[in-house]
Design a protein with these regions (language model features):
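Membrane-cytosol interface segments of multi-pass membrane proteins
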Residues: 1-193, 199, 211, 309-310, ...
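Interfacial loop-to-helix junctions that mark the boundaries of transmembrane helices
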Residues: 47-50, 205, 236-238, 269-272, ...
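Alpha-helical transmembrane segments of multi-pass integral membrane proteins
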Residues: 53, 211, 215, 219, ...
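Cytoplasmic membrane-interface segments at the C-terminal ends of transmembrane helices
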Residues: 73-80, 228, 289-296
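Membrane-interface helix-boundary motifs at transmembrane edges
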Residues: 117-118, 167-175, 225-238, 294-303
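Internal transmembrane alpha-helix with an interfacial aromatic "cap," most often the third helix
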Residues: 161, 218-231
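Signature aromatic-anchored transmembrane alpha helix within multi-pass, membrane-resident enzymes
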Residues: 181-183, 235-251
Length: 391
């Protein structure tokens, strides 16, 4: 990433473009996976499509990296750690995630009522989704009538719950904290794997303990990046080029792991055992490109803009595509078997264009109508609170 210059631009240790790059890649991969499931058109290499669901793991990695980066930077610079105020942290996270999520949930509820009507099961399903606990109950997780992709918000919510305690501990004693997180995932994995093939396994392999090691990799990546991202070496061209080359090598490693994941006979079993190698490769991409050559300004702005859309895109893409295909029956089709199942390649191509266009347009609309206004409200609230404390 970037262009060769005699004096490379400084490493952006506050917000590396590599984080935006990986976020766009992860969200795009998840979107490509779900859209491919509906139209069967292979617009990407097939192994990237078949293994596209692992992009969720990279989003979890990025959450840990980005949230912990201010702590890592303070630790690397010998500055006081950020103030750990759980209430303020929870308020910011809620303002960031919940408005767009609840709008999406309202739409999915309307669809569920339209398709099946009200029921006691739907009420319990809705209650779990409103409280971000949907992944903890079978009927609101794999049996949900609402938006199926939002199970990840349970994982994020549990991480946010412990982050105010975890961040200062990890900044002061990184090795023990990171080791314990990895141990939790390893022990949980060894407990869950023997249940592969049972109905219980589908409920287990994506639960929060199965991501604790992923969170550790994200926080470790932040510590490494913050420690290496300053100093005289960052002003020399050769080492920065070397980091960019290492980032490309990490991408090749990532591609090989995706190929292995896509070809696994026991896909979900391998997904659990292959999770740490995949996030280690993604973490290497993040750190190496972050320390490498800085991309040109237009590229950075484009990546930042696309990354800003990733949350709304993630929330809406699958539910929207299924709605367009089966409820609106677009592109037009009749009968009981969708055209992709009949090998209609012209329909597949048209569907691919329509589904991507709809997902992107709705994501843009939701970002500007929901996410951005509430982000502005959050900033104003924070400024008022700080002004009140200063009096």
């Amino acid at each position: 990433m970037g262009v060769l210059t005699a004096a490379p631009a400084p490493v952006d240790t506050a917000r590396p473009a590599a984080a935006d790059f990986l976020r766009v890649l992860a969200a795009g991969l998840v979107g490509a996976f779900h859209i491919w499931q509906q139209n069967w058109r292979a617009a990407l290499p097939e192994h990237w499509l078949r293994a596209g669901c692992v992009g969720v793991d990279w989003l979890v990695l990025l959450s840990a990296f980005c949230l912990f980066l201010p702590w890592a930077n303070a630790s690397a610079q010998g500055k006081p750690l950020p103030a750990a105020c759980p209430a303020e942290f929870y308020r910011r996270r809620a303002m960031r995630l919940l408005p767009a999520y609840y709008i999406n949930l309202l739409f999915s509820l309307a669809l569920a009522v339209y398709r099946r009507g009200w029921s006691r099961a739907l009420v319990w399903d809705l209650a779990a989704h409103l409280t971000l606990t949907q992944q903890l109950f079978p009927q609101s997780y794999i049996g949900t009538q609402l938006n199926g992709v939002t199970w990840t918000l349970t994982v994020f919510a549990l991480f946010y719950l412990v982050f105010p305690l975890l961040a200062p501990l990890c900044a002061r004693r990184p090795l023990p904290v990171l080791a314990w997180l990895c141990i939790v995932q390893a022990v949980y994995t060894q407990w869950a794997l023997p249940q592969y093939g049972s109905n219980a396994y589908a409920l287990l392999f994506n639960q929060f303990p199965a991501f604790c090691g992923v969170l550790a990799v994200g926080m470790a990546a932040a510590l490494i990046f913050a420690q290496l991202g300053r100093g005289a070496w960052t002003q020399r061209l050769a080492p920065r080029v070397g980091c960019t080359v290492l980032g490309v090598v990490a991408l090749v490693w990532l591609d090989a792991l995706l190929r292995a994941q896509a070809g696994a006979a026991e896909f979900q079993r391998f997904q659990l055992t292959n999770r740490m190698p995949l996030v280690l490769a993604a973490g290497a991409v993040l750190v190496c490109f972050g320390l490498g050559l800085t991309p040109p300004r237009p590229v950075r702005r484009a990546l930042h803009g696309l990354a800003a859309l990733s949350y709304s895109f993630y929330l809406w893409h699958q539910m929207l595509v299924v709605f367009i295909k089966y409820d609106l029956q677009l592109p037009a089709w009749q009968g009981t078997a969708p055209p992709n199942q009949l090998g209609n390649t012209a329909w597949m191509q048209c569907a691919d264009r329509l589904y991507w266009a709809a997902a992107i347009l709705v994501s843009v609309a939701m970002y500007f109508l929901a996410e951005k206004p509430f982000a502005g409200l959050q900033n104003k609230t924070a400024q008022k609170m700080h002004a009140g404390k200063a009096r």
